[in-house]
From Swiss-Prot:
Part of the 30S ribosomal subunit. Contacts proteins S3 and S10. Gene3D superfamilies: 30s Ribosomal Protein S14, Chain N. PROSITE patterns: RIBOSOMAL_S14 (PS00527). The gene is rpsZ. This is Small ribosomal subunit protein uS14. One of its GO terms (biological process) is translation. Keywords: Metal-binding, Ribonucleoprotein, Ribosomal protein, RNA-binding, rRNA-binding, Zinc. Its cofactor is Zn(2+). PANTHER family: 30S RIBOSOMAL PROTEIN S14 (PTHR19836), SMALL RIBOSOMAL SUBUNIT PROTEIN US14M (PTHR19836:SF19). Belongs to the universal ribosomal protein uS14 family. Zinc-binding uS14 subfamily. NCBIfam families: PRK08061.1. Zn(2+) binds at residues 24, 27, 40, 43. GO terms for molecular function: rRNA binding; structural constituent of ribosome; zinc ion binding.
Length: 61
């Protein structure tokens, strides 16, 4: 419940632009947000391993 309200609060336009921050739309996590994909690192890993992110492959060398 608290995390849901924080997601809603983060989506509103802040009084000052410096207060704006990104949250994962799936889990609501505020840290480790990957801007290119618009999700956090944990959701990124799970979606990439399921093959839901096109063009993302596990690196190997």
């Amino acid at each position: 419940m608290a995390r849901t309200s924080l997601v809603v609060k983060a989506s509103r336009e802040p009084k000052f632009s410096a207060r704006k921050y990104n949250r994962c739309p799936i889990c609501g996590r505020p840290r480790a947000f990957i801007r290119k994909f618009g999700i956090c690192r944990i959701c990124f890993r799970s979606m990439a391993s399921m093959g839901k992110l096109p063009g993302v492959t596990k690196s190997s060398w």
